[in-house]
Amino acid sequence: MGLSDGREVTTGSGLHGGCLCGNVRFRVEAVSRVHNCHCDMCRRTTGSAFAVLVWVASENLSWDSARPTYRRSSPIARRGFCKACGSPLSLAYDASPQETALRVGCFDEPGSLAPQYNYGSTQRLGWVCCGIDLPHRETKQQW
């Protein structure tokens, strides 16, 4: 798991994951950070109250089979999904091409990928209490 001070943590034999139908599979060698994102964009693209994002350096991510299909979700980011089953898989910001965020639910064994902080906390829905005790960081983006 990633550390809050920005250091990456290697995963030993790697973490594996993919989409619901198995068409898109990936392997992660090291995780940079994990956080809950409460921003409007993540809430809308997940169809849920918030997203849990696992950030990895691009060189630590390999696609084992088909790659995701991408679409622009905003002027600053694009999202990857499986074109066969529609599973949302990734998020990449134009300003940070060296890293990719993967959805925690796409990992085969996500239990060790606990969030370290909340992002976009001012946009958090009032009834969401999961991770409320974690540190909070803000975003200026509104969608």
Regions found by a protein language model. Give the residues of each.
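A short Gly-Trp-Pro
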Residues: 1-143
